[in-house]
Amino acid sequence: QESEDVVSFYFRPTDGGPVPSYLPGQYTTVRVFSKAMQIAQPRQYTLSQAAGSGMLRISVKLVLGTQGAPDGLVSSILHNRVKVGDVVELSAPTGGFALEDAKSEHPLVLIAAGIGITPMVPMLETLAVENPLRKVHFLYTTQNLAHYPLKKEVDAAIKGMPNAAKGIFL
């Protein structure tokens, strides 16, 4: 449980093979079966952890319907039905919103709101390891601290980067 409405899921290949490589900020497509619709439903989720852990992690916000709208179908299935040990279909990591050059000396500003923090965390984690002296500004807004997922990871990455600063707006 990452926050009041966000849960992380960790995946490894069922064949025991290696986890595919990916760039910080990339995503995977998750397919789960909807009993109500009798069909597999795909959704894209950012990989919310830097590569190298031997697992893929996604962090999923439970989408609750408002004003008569239904709850999020796939987020509800993931939060309420998927258990440790279940097999879930994932695509290979992909996506163009990625930190491609962690070694760059150019200053970097990362801005996120709500669940949009998920691509920023692996970017910060990668920078903390590969280029800890890079000047980075991380700006994040959320409803309140109960809705601040991955806070520990952000704090740990920023702590290891002497030229980094963060601004949190509630």
Question: What are these regions, as identified by a protein language model?
Answer:
Residues E105, V129-V136:
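Conserved S-adenosyl-L-methionine
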Residues Q1-V87, T142-N144, D155, F169-L170:
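Ferredoxin-reductase
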Residues A92-E105:
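A short, basic/flexible loop-to-alpha-helix module at the beginning of a structural domain
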Residues V109-I111:
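Conserved beta-strand elements of the Class I
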Residues K135-L170:
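Reductase modules of NAD(P)H-dependent flavoproteins
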Residues L47, I117-V129:
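Histidine-anchored nucleotide/phosphate-binding helix
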Residues L127-N131, A157-I158:
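Active-site catalytic pocket residues across diverse enzymes, especially alpha/beta-hydrolases
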